[in-house]
């Protein structure tokens, strides 16, 4: 996962604990989880939406009939 080993994850966790404190950590993680869930939901909703067919206007085609001069 992102090339992070166990020691790197432990160091990151300790830094997060120092910054936010043990009391706020569950709230911060819950908010982060809701954000990720909302992001995934939005991405799936975009994939589920039917693609609107592209309507191309016909180019100004010249008449194939020969015009009498």
Curated annotation (Swiss-Prot):
Subcellular location, record wording: Cell inner membrane
Transmembrane segments: 1-21
Keywords: Cell inner membrane, Cell membrane, Membrane, Protein transport, Translocation, Transmembrane, Transmembrane helix, Transport
GO molecular function: protein transmembrane transporter activity
Keyword Cell inner membrane: yes
Annotated disulfide bonds: none
Membrane topology: Single-pass membrane protein
Spans annotated as Disordered: 44-69
Coiled coil spans: none
Main location: membrane
GO biological process, one term: protein transport by the Tat complex
One Gene Ontology CC term in the entry: TAT protein transport complex
Pfam families associated with the record: TatA_B_E
Function: Part of the twin-arginine translocation (Tat) system that transports large folded proteins containing a characteristic twin-arginine motif in their signal peptide across membranes. TatA could form the protein-conducting channel of the Tat system.
Record's subunit section: The Tat system comprises two distinct complexes: a TatABC complex, containing multiple copies of TatA, TatB and TatC subunits, and a separate TatA complex, containing only TatA subunits. Substrates initially bind to the TatABC complex, which probably triggers association of the separate TatA complex to form the active translocon.
Entry-linked PANTHER family: SEC-INDEPENDENT PROTEIN TRANSLOCASE PROTEIN TATA (PTHR42982:SF1)
Protein family (similarity comment): Belongs to the TatA/E family.
The name this protein goes by in its record: Sec-independent protein translocase protein TatA
Species name: Magnetococcus marinus (strain ATCC BAA-1437 / JCM 17883 / MC-1)
Lineage of origin: Bacteria, Pseudomonadati, Pseudomonadota, Alphaproteobacteria, Magnetococcales
């Amino acid at each position: 996962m992102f090339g992070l080993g166990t020691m790197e994850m432990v160091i990151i966790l300790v830094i997060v604990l120092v910054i936010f404190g043990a009391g706020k950590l569950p709230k911060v993680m819950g908010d982060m989880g809701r954000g990720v869930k909302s992001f995934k939901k939005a991405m799936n909703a975009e994939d589920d939406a039917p693609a609107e067919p592209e309507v191309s206007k016909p180019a100004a085609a010249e008449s194939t009939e020969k015009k009498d001069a």
